[in-house]
């Protein structure tokens, strides 16, 4: 049964809140179906936006949409910038939008509220919905770059998200006694996969907005007896500062890391720490296009394979393009394809289970894979994939400036011509408020002129050399 079936685990606890409230699997199933009943009921399947807060009602609506087989949600962060949300609404014309209920949770114009709970408010489109119906087996939509509000979406089938959750259960050896805590946004594919896999195992998840540097987080984690702690590279840097070992987390049995490359010194440090406190440390690789997990390093091999992304997850396989060395993944969790507007949601399976990752790699003699570069202009910032072209366009449009964006994981570099009037402060503030990019990850440089290719396009390799 799919992880959203829920019913088979009955009286077991599925979700826990900061308040101490709990929800069993049976209660979650009833709540999910009840909330889904407040979505538009008609002869065709619908598309909706779920601003995915970390609360019972938002999780229940997500599961209710999956259980219905009729409603396809796009998962979005609850704090998405209004301009980014408006752009997405214009492109995809959702039939419904589910927001939070706080003062910052206003719904775009053209929608009327139909139902509200403590955690969510459901709004329906006022005008007649578009005739384009999302085609089965499409079950879920995710943004390719949530922080910039990219309008390019990943189309995932029901099989993709369920098979990936089952594979994660298998290699992490999750069971009914496991308990995770929400250290990541649930709209982010890594955060979503933690929720999905624990539900697939009949385990439980503690929902909180607290951060790893918060005393309340650690008090909640301790009293909830969590068994796993997950994060992206920037969060593992926080975890180092927070001092995991002195937190007395005796119930902890695993640490899991994804969302970008963790530096080798930090990998060594956390491998040594995990051995000392008696838990396992999993370093993993994935992409939203694979729902999202692709590979992992077995903890027992991490010391010997420190720079590796590991081996393919159960049910999947990895290979290299013989010409370009691009990493190619095959598996049932590969997306159906991309979408850039409402009409694309009626598209067929364009990928046929094959994903060209855009990463360049190599394979060692034992079959472990390593990344050596990228074909595409993407970086990871605080675990979120950022499209450099999107950021560059947003900045150029906002400030009417001649500029270019380059970078590496955990570092975005903005290069402007010296004559640009825009200030560094204005750029950092724009990136913080519009793209949710932490100012400390941004480097701003000015040059007399920017390099261009013969056909008039910005020369990114030359720009990168300028920054060395």
Model-derived features with residue positions:
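Conserved pre-ATP/AMP-binding loop-to-beta segment of ANL
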Residues: 6-11, 118-143, 150, 173-179
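Conserved AMP-binding A3 loop
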Residues: 24-25, 139-166
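Conserved ATP-binding/catalytic segment of the ANL
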Residues: 326-389, 397
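Conserved C-terminal "lid"/linker of ANL adenylate-forming enzymes
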Residues: 379, 406, 429-468
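Conserved AMP-binding/adenylate-forming
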Residues: 37-79, 183-184, 385
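Conserved AMP-binding/adenylate-forming core of the ANL superfamily
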Residues: 11-42, 53-55, 83-86, 156-159
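Conserved AMP-binding/adenylation subdomain of ANL enzymes
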Residues: 162-179, 187-228
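Gly/Ser/Thr-rich phosphate-binding loop
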Residues: 226-231, 240-303, 317
